[in-house]
Swiss-Prot record:
Gene3D superfamilies: Urease metallochaperone UreE, N-terminal domain, UreE, C-terminal domain. Belongs to the UreE family. InterPro entries: UreE (IPR012406), UreE_C_dom (IPR007864), UreE_N (IPR004029), UreE_N_sf (IPR036118). Keywords: Chaperone, Cytoplasm, Nickel. Involved in urease metallocenter assembly. Binds nickel. Probably functions as a nickel donor during metallocenter assembly. Residues 137-167 are annotated as: Disordered. GO terms for molecular function: nickel cation binding; unfolded protein binding. Its main location: cytoplasm. This is Urease accessory protein UreE.
């Protein structure tokens, strides 16, 4: 069985994957896992640190061959606002509830939740059930937990940190 110990970000030039693995958003945060490829083969993902993979990222097998990460279609709500200001207001309400959301110019996608749907419709949004890939925005608290920048540095950014709780 082939092992995967590295990856390349989506859009890497001159990359031709030999296979794909389709995963929903909640299964794309990985470090070590046996992955079942579309062709029926399996590979062992074995990374040094967890990575939050995006649609189109490429896993690099030990033999150099590439496997594409594909965002699986998921049952979502498509939220359409009245205008751009309304979209910002709706996004604020979703963020205030710590919900994963894919925010686009003219719509927001979230996982289906009928309580949230009622709230959004009460705020004047049009909410429709859709099934499509989900790539939620990465939150501020996850800023250093996704893709590596290829170098190490301290995270002090020139200021003191004051620990506090949001409880």
């Amino acid at each position: 069985m082939q092992r995967v110990t590295s990856y390349l970000p989506a859009g890497t030039p001159s990359s031709n994957p030999i296979d794909r693995v389709e995963l929903p958003h909640d299964l794309r945060h990985l470090r070590r896992k046996l992955l079942h490829l579309e062709n029926g083969e399996m590979v062992m993902l074995d990374l040094k640190e967890p990575v939050l993979f995006a649609n189109g990222d490429l896993l690099v097998r030990e033999d150099g061959e590439l496997i594409e990460i594909v965002a699986a279609p998921e049952k979502l709500f498509e939220i359409k606002p009245r205008n751009r200001l309304h979209l910002i207001e709706l996004a604020w309400h979703l963020g205030n509830r710590h919900l994963s959301a894919q925010i686009e110019e003219e719509r927001i996608l979230i996982l289906r939740d009928h309580v949230i749907r009622a709230m959004l419709e009460g705020l004047g949004a049009t909410v429709t059930e859709v099934s499509e890939p989900f790539q939620p925005a990465r939150g501020a608290y996850h800023a250093h937990g996704g893709h590596s920048h290829g170098h190490d540095h301290g995270h002090s950014h020139g200021h003191d940190h004051h620990d506090h709780s949001h409880d």
